[in-house]
């Protein structure tokens, strides 16, 4: 059984904002050591040139993995989640683009200055030469031109995940009908639920067919919020992600491990703003199982559900 993290920017001092392919392989190695079989490295929004440079590095790292004839991907059973370290690196299976077609008003920790309109010309310039490697693109469905772009992405066999968004319920539903398949890190960096406008959050929880990413560490979502998700949402459509970043697992004796960010109460910047997830998906799954969640359901959230989503 494969464990799959579809949303990781980095880990252990490395991230996808690099021109060094060894950094991407280090990310795969650290995830593998935590029992993850496959990862989809996630690219930060930046200029199109920089994003393409980052994608090229991931592509080269994938090619190096494939060229290593001794390489075997990790696989674990339900009973071995976070109990037996896996030494083989996780297999890099593609690229997730988190942007740049996002709403700057819901950018979260991302750089709002790098977010651009979802035009066809911007899209084609971004993906040229990487069409076969890109698995997921996060798009804010309320942006002008987003519906057309989502249809184009779906026609190419790439998944659109809706996120970093101020979309209403109707705008989210329109994005779903245009071909979007998921919602990026539900509750985080999106319009809040209102009793007169449930928004993207309400659609994500209520629609039985749309997939939702969940950052199940102790910092992004209150335990009762996670309980709400598992009570309301079709369990076949919940995908636990790490949303891990360079600072995740980069421990240091001081609370400030690298200038500008802190560990302890999650991975945050100096203002206390969350930068990304602090746990691997296997750690997050074990945490939920230890809290009393059904082991089979939780395990599917890091195995069968993401695998089905990516088909």
Segments (PLM) and residue ranges:
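Divalent metal-dependent hydrolysis catalytic cores, especially in the metallo-beta-lactamase
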Residues: 9, 25-57, 90-103, 130-142, ...
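Active-site glycine- and acidic-residue-rich loops that bind
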Residues: 48-53, 142-144, 161-165, 215-232
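Divalent metal-binding pocket/active-site signature
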Residues: 97, 104-199
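Residue-level marker for buried hydrophobic side chains located in beta-strands
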Residues: 2-4, 161, 238-241
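Active-site-adjacent C-terminal substructures of enzyme catalytic domains
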Residues: 171-297
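Short, basic, low-complexity termini and linkers enriched in Ser/Thr/Gly/Pro
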Residues: 65-89, 254-259
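Active-site mouth loops of central-metabolism enzymes
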Residues: 10-22, 43, 109-116, 159-163
């Amino acid at each position: 059984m494969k464990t799959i993290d579809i949303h990781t920017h980095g880990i252990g001092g490395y991230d996808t904002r690099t021109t060094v392919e060894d950094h991407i392989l280090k990310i795969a190695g650290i995830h593998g050591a935590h029992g993850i079989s496959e990862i989809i490295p996630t690219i930060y929004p930046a200029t199109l040139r920089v994003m393409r440079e980052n994608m090229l590095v991931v592509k080269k790292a994938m090619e190096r993995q494939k060229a290593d004839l001794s390489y075997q991907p990790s696989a674990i059973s339900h009973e071995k989640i976070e109990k037996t370290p896996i030494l083989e690196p996780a297999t890099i299976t593609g690229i997730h683009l988190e942007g740049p077609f996002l709403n700057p008003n819901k950018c979260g920790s991302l750089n709002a200055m790098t977010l651009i309109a979802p035009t066809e010309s911007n899209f084609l310039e971004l993906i040229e030469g990487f069409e076969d490697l890109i698995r997921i693109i996060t798009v804010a469905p309320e942006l002008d031109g987003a519906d057309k772009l989502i249809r184009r992405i779906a026609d190419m066999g790439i998944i659109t995940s809706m996120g970093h968004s101020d979309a209403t319920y109707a705008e989210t539903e329109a994005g779903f009908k245009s071909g979007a398949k998921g919602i990026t890190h539900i509750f985080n960096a999106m319009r809040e639920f209102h009793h007169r406008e449930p928004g993207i959050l309400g659609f994500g929880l209520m629609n039985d067919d749309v997939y939702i990413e969940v950052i199940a560490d102790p910092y992004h979502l209150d335990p009762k919020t996670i309980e709400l998700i598992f009570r309301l949402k079709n369990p076949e459509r919940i995908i636990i992600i790490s949303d891990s970043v360079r600072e995740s697992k980069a421990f240091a004796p001081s609370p400030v491990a690298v200038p500008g960010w802190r560990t302890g109460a999650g991975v945050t910047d100096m203002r206390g703003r969350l930068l990304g997830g602090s746990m691997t998906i296997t750690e997050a799954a074990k945490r939920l199982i230890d809290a009393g969640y059904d082991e089979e359901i939780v395990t599917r959230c890091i195995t069968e559900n993401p695998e089905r989503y990516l088909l």
